[in-house]
Curated annotation (Swiss-Prot):
Homology family: Belongs to the universal ribosomal protein uL15 family.
Keyword Ribosomal protein listed: yes
GO BP term, example: translation
Keyword tags: Ribonucleoprotein, Ribosomal protein, RNA-binding, rRNA-binding
Descriptive protein name: Large ribosomal subunit protein uL15
Amino acid sequence: MELNTLKPAKNSVKQNTRYGRGQGSGKGGTSTRGHKGAKSRSGYKSKPGFEGGQLPLQRRLPMYGFKNPNRVSYKPINLDTIQQLAEKAQLTVINPEVLHQHGLVSKRDKCKILGNGLLKTKLEVTAHAFSASASAAIEKLGGKANILNIYA
C-alpha cells in the first residue's frame, strides 16, 4: 500500500444526485422544481419573512417599546479584576485613566464597578457608577468610592 494507491472503502462514498442532466437520469426535465412560477426560475430567492402574500407575523404583531436615544451604557468591571490590577501594578488609586492604560476600558467607555470577587487592599476607586455591594466592599476596607459625573 502506498499513498498514491489509497482509495476509499467500497460503498463509503455516495454520489450526489445530478439534476437537469437529461430524462434518462430520472431527475431531468423540471429538475425537481415543478412547472412554472417564480420558484422554478433561476435566480429566485425568497425574501425573509415573506409568507406567500399572507400578512407576515412581524406585521401582525403590535409594535412594542423603543430604544432610548439618551441611554447610558456602562462597561462592567468586577472587584476581582481591580484587585488583580492593584496587585500587578502596585496601585492604590484606580480611575478610568488607569483602567484605560491597562486595556480594560476604551477612552470613551463609562465604567461601572460591580461587587463580584474579593477585595483585599485599601483602594481609592473613581468610576462613573458603583453597585451597592461594590461600594460597600471598598468602604469596608477603609477605601473610597468616588463617583464621576457621566456627562462631564
